[in-house]
Amino acid sequence: MFFVISGLVIVNSAAAATAMSFLKGRILRLYPAVWICASLTLIVIATQDVNRRIIKNYLRSITLYPGGPWIDGQYWTLACEICFYALVFIMCAMGQKARMPALALGLSLASTVFIALLYALPDSDILAIFTETAWRAIPFYYGCQFAIGIYIWLLSQARMSRISWVGLICALVTGAAQIYMAGENTSERTLAAAGHSFSPLPAVAIWVAGLISIVASVTYAKQISRLPTALLQSVKTLGSMTYPLYLLHFAIGVQLLDWLTDLEMTPLLALALAVPIVCVMSLAVCKWGEPPIRSVLRLVFDRLGQRVAGLQAKESRV
């Protein structure tokens, strides 16, 4: 679902942007929260252990180095995001923004072929490179999810052709198969580790429900915009919290659970306290941490732009 939303939002952002303004917007969106959250994670980890490996992981995280390993496991998804951003940036730089349907189709077909091969050859070491290593950032495995997001945007713009509908159907079928296969894999590992398994169908149902909610929010955007301002602002804040919450929830959340259970709290009570603590931290990051950093970065970009413009003006006079 994360990548579906990204496909929708990123293509929508690129539609009215130049290549450089798109790049600037992505830097302003990604880096401030990463700098804060990775630093907070490092502080928490340092209470238990700190060594050269952890520092290297931290540096890879704050630079969003796509190869990993990072300070916390979930940063791998940002590597996938950056690869997708690179594709969109290249299209903007080449003046090919009107060909976003072709990008969606390419992602959809590539992902369909890859998932089909993965189903037919589940033990392939070559395919595992693109699912289990840093190379998974290349959008073979997750390309269908990005494609669905792009197709939702195309639907909102009434730009769906017959071939786009074929691409959307491929992406939906492949996406459902991917979720089901991932659920089966998780179930098998749970069976081996804990002695019980579960059906992957609920995961597929949740994914479908998420897609329906995204399509509904785009379809009824005008009606939603007429809701009370206070409600819309609250929803916007909750949306802004999701990014830092995603970056903070695992390492810091687990450490909080350890600390709280060490105080002889029951696991359920520890969880009930850890969740709001991490949510409050996420709110603090998005409301008071990210904005000042973005302001400084904007100032830096503006000054760089002025210098470049000045140099270009001097060269034109020579």
Q: Where are the regions a protein language model picked out?
A:
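Flexible domain-boundary/linker segments
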Residues: 24, 40, 44, 79, ...
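Membrane-interface helix-loop-helix regions
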Residues: 1, 5, 10-13, 19, ...
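Small-polar-interrupted transmembrane alpha-helices in polytopic inner-membrane proteins
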Residues: 102-120, 168-174, 278
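Charged, low-complexity, helix-prone segments enriched in Lys/Glu/Asp/Gln
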Residues: 113-115, 304, 318
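Short, surface-exposed, polar/charged, turn-prone segments marking secondary-structure boundaries
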Residues: 31-32, 50-51, 91-93, 106, ...
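Alpha-helical transmembrane segments in multi-pass integral membrane proteins
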Residues: 12-21, 87-99, 127-287, 291-306
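Short, charged juxtamembrane terminal tails flanking transmembrane helices
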Residues: 310-318
